[in-house]
């Protein structure tokens, strides 16, 4: 029995077998990715004795490969379903883990670029393609199968699993490396993504109507979801800055453990996702988006002047609650705006703006920090969500998406 038939029989049910399978697969896949990503810096510096610029280059390769591969995957999931590409993304991550393991013994290096091992470059690129393929397919599955009346709530619950995976992976990776070594870490990560691949095979969908999105492998944006995607970008730019510069900012101000900011973000976002998705479904998407983005901006501004652990924790709570309130509603709005056969392309566009936000956030923030200092980075990061809110409200006022309301007359945007 397919997930859509189940949804038709229980039109308001979120926790179906398909939702459980894609959620557990995401938990395994995201845990693997966090194990890999949080170990790259240690691997490059400790194992290969290379500089931190190589770490940045490898992360850049991963993000670029993720960005470029999202668009064809989005189009293909609209035509062929999510199961094949969720499985394929997990399978590619297994190959990435194998490449990381082999790089420990096969150290053939590029003749340029400071002697970076070829297998490290390959592994990073594969992990980027795996990330975008799996996450686009999983998001598309959610977009097609959850009930419209509980769409933002379902996206929020799905995000809880991603948050748990991030906390789990980031929390144990260094422990595994110190106790068992890099080879064991990548073996464990590979086993986790094998589990994700097997769970993905259990996903079931009905055949989809023919997509209007042109077939191909090019760079194609879904124009209908540009507005919520840009709003997402305005928030993610600050997030990219946070991962890169909050540890440096905290240490420069005498805070011994600025990483408490990330702990506060993780805990508060999980709690918020469990509670705030219903607001967007019952009161409209903007009832969650606007306050969520404003609270995120407030949190970033607190970071700009934080000089104690308590201030970093307070900022983390604000950012966690704000982002976890706004992001599911933005994603749900993007799904709402997509045609019924183009939700894969819509999710690819939405998450591509997220990838681009991480890339540009880290790069531009570095330039700002060099010129004006670390505090200024987070003042700018606080302004960006406010600009995003203003732009989204302007778009809403000018466009008044009547087509959306015609497709889903019970929905309030």
Language model features with spans:
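Residue-level signature of mid-helix packing/kink "hotspots" within the transmembrane helices
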Residues: 63-67, 71, 166-167, 266-270, ...
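Helix-loop boundary and gating motifs at the non-cytosolic
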Residues: 17-59, 63, 231, 237-249, ...
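C-terminal ends and interior cores of transmembrane alpha-helices
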Residues: 91-113, 295-307
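Cytoplasmic helix-loop-helix junction between adjacent transmembrane helices
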Residues: 125-161
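C-terminal membrane-cytosol helix-exit motif in multi-pass small-molecule transporters
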Residues: 191-209, 391-396
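Helix-to-loop junctions at the C-terminal end of transmembrane segments
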Residues: 69-81, 272-284
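Hydrophobic core of transmembrane alpha-helices in multi-pass small-molecule transporters
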Residues: 27, 111-133, 312-325
């Amino acid at each position: 029995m397919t997930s859509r038939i189940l949804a038709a029989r229980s039109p308001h049910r979120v926790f179906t077998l398909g939702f459980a399978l894609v959620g557990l697969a995401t938990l395994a896949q995201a845990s693997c990715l966090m194990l890999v990503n949080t170990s790259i810096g240690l691997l490059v510096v400790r194992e290969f004795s290379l500089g931190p610029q190589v770490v940045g280059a490898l992360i850049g390769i991963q993000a670029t490969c993720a960005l470029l591969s999202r668009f064809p995957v989005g189009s293909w999931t609209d035509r062929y379903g999510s199961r094949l590409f969720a499985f394929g993304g997990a399978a590619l991550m297994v190959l990435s883990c194998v490449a990381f393991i082999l790089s420990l013994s096969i150290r053939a290096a590029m003749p340029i670029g400071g002697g970076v091992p070829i297998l490290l470059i390959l592994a990073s690129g594969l992990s980027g393609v795996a990330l975008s393929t799996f996450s686009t397919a999983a998001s598309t599955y959610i977009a097609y199968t959850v009930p419209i009346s509980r769409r933002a709530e379902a996206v929020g619950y799905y995000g809880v699993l991603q948050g748990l995976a991030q906390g789990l992976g980031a929390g144990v990776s260094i422990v595994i490396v110190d106790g068992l070594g890099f080879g064991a870490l990548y073996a464990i990560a590979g086993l986790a993504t094998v589990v994700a691949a097997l769970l993905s095979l259990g996903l079931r969908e009905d055949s989809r109507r023919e997509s209007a999105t042109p077939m191909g492998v090019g760079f194609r944006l879904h124009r209908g979801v540009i507005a919520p995607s840009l709003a997402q970008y305005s928030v993610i730019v600050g997030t990219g800055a946070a991962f890169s510069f909050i540890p440096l900012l905290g240490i420069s101000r005498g805070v011994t453990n600025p990483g408490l900011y990330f702990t506060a973000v993780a805990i508060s976002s999980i709690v918020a996702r469990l509670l705030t998705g219903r607001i967007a479904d019952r009161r409209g998407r903007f009832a969650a988006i606007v306050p969520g983005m404003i609270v995120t901006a407030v949190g970033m501004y607190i970071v700009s002047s934080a000089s104690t652990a308590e201030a970093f924790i307070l900022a983390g709570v604000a950012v966690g609650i704000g982002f976890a309130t706004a992001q599911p509603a933005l994603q749900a709005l993007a799904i709402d705006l997509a045609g019924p056969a183009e939700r894969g392309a819509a999710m690819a566009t939405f998450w591509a703006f997220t990838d681009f936000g991480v890339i540009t956030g880290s790069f531009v923030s570095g330039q700002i920090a060099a010129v004006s200092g670390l505090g200024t980075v987070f003042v700018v990061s606080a302004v960006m969500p406010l600009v995003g809110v203003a732009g989204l409200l302007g778009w809403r006022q000018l466009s008044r998406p009547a087509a959306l309301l015609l497709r889903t007359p019970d929905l309030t945007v």
